[in-house]
């Protein structure tokens, strides 16, 4: 029983020590020296113009001005960065040429092989179908009132 008690204390001290170390590292981390929104916009422009497969990490580094390590630390991978750009697009799809180009890139380059990208594309197109229906309905009602 005593062995179990001491083993439990040891495990508790390891958890506390790991927790302290984790908190210490969080406090000592440097704040980001870039605006994530700006980086997403720059990546969005690049992906829309060059496609997903046509955009390299070097292209993203040049476009965003981030170091390669900072890009990977902030976003994990080119694929994750693209997903974040798509999620941002889903929140503010504006029917601009760039938005349509990016959606086309997602549907063509990644959606056939990536379930998460397919889901985001469905969310974008599904929400826009409702918008089209509302706009069309409003337009039809206006035409009917004219007659």
Question: PLM features: residue spans?
Answer:
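Helix-turn-helix
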Residues: 34-38, 42-80, 84
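Hydrophobic/aromatic residues within well-ordered alpha-helical segments
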Residues: 78, 85, 89, 124-128
């Amino acid at each position: 029983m005593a062995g179990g008690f001491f083993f439990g204390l040891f495990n508790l001290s390891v958890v506390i020590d790991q927790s302290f170390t984790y908190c210490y590292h969080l406090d000592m981390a440097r704040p980001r020296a870039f605006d994530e929104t700006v980086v997403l916009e720059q990546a969005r422009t690049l992906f829309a113009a060059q496609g997903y497969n046509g955009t390299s990490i070097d292209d993203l580094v040049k476009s965003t001005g981030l170091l390669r390590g900072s890009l990977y630390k902030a976003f994990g991978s080119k694929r994750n960065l693209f997903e974040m750009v798509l999620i941002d697009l889903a929140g503010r799809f504006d029917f601009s040429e760039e938005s349509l180009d990016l959606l086309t890139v997602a549907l063509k380059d990644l959606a056939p092989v990536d379930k998460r990208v397919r889901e985001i594309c469905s969310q974008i197109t599904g929400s826009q179908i409702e918008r089209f229906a509302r706009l069309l309905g409003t337009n039809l009602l206006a035409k009917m009132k004219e007659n």
